[in-house]
Amino acid sequence: SAGWSISYELDNESPAENALKLALKLSSNKEALSINELRMINPEKILVTANEIFKLGYWSVIDNHSIKKPIKESFAKGDFHNVDLIIGSNADEELMYIDNESFKELVEEREEWGIYNKVIDFEDLSNHLENDLERINFVLSSINYVCPSFYIADQVSSVINNKVWFYSFDKVRFGKKAQEMGAYHGAELPYIFDTHDAWLPTSYQDEYLTKIIQNSWLNFMKTGNPNIDEIAWPRHKPSQFKVLSFDKELNSKIHDSKDFCLSLNI
């Protein structure tokens, strides 16, 4: 549910440059601290200082050890682990961040990198939504999560001909706060692992959906196929955008972001 990290290539010197900045910032003189000297620094001080310098978050870093080339290039060439896959995205990946000041800073940062240059080109593809908040959520969720995840699914199912199933998690819990958050980033995880915390309004409907999802995931692990008696999950085929929607009801559908992803051409 975070395919966005493969979509943009960063300068592989940036992590090294930032590491040097950190070593200099923590130094009491003008010389960068060595790794052994850094190990002597209080971890909390390192963390606070690192948060001022490192802003790449979950971006993949080409370190020439674990990652030797851009992740997207690996997917394009089929240079990845040969496994079947369940992959998906949520309806409101970006919604709860939109009014948050930290989100605004993140957007400004990504804009500087040229990541959102194409957003203005897709206004017509989001005009079916009722308000600006929904449109912004749709555009950013599609760019950062949905479309890159479909790219991964396409490559896994075509380049090495593995079996892939794509889900769209659309279930919104009951309550005012839940309505504000929507089907937020990671909303499916309590259902997959049956970890509904006390603060989450959990209904019988949610408990039923939990059993369905767990049985489906377990069947996938046992047999390589997530289909069980209660669901008919279509196998992913490149560029068709067929998904299983986990919502109040389970249903197969063409993903809402299909036209957007085709226009984005990730």
Model regions and ranges:
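Flexible "cap/lid" loop of the alpha/beta hydrolase fold
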Residues: 2-23
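Substrate-gating cap/lid region and adjacent catalytic-acid/histidine neighborhood
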Residues: 5, 36-40, 44-205
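Glycine-rich, phosphate-binding/catalytic loops in enzymes
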Residues: 14, 102-106, 229
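Alpha-helical packing segments of well-folded alpha/beta enzyme cores
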Residues: 19, 148, 213-217
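Short, charged, surface-exposed loops that flank catalytic or proteolytic processing sites
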Residues: 25-40
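Alpha/beta-hydrolase-fold serine-hydrolase catalytic core, especially in secreted/extracellular enzymes
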Residues: 65-66, 131, 155-164, 172-173, ...
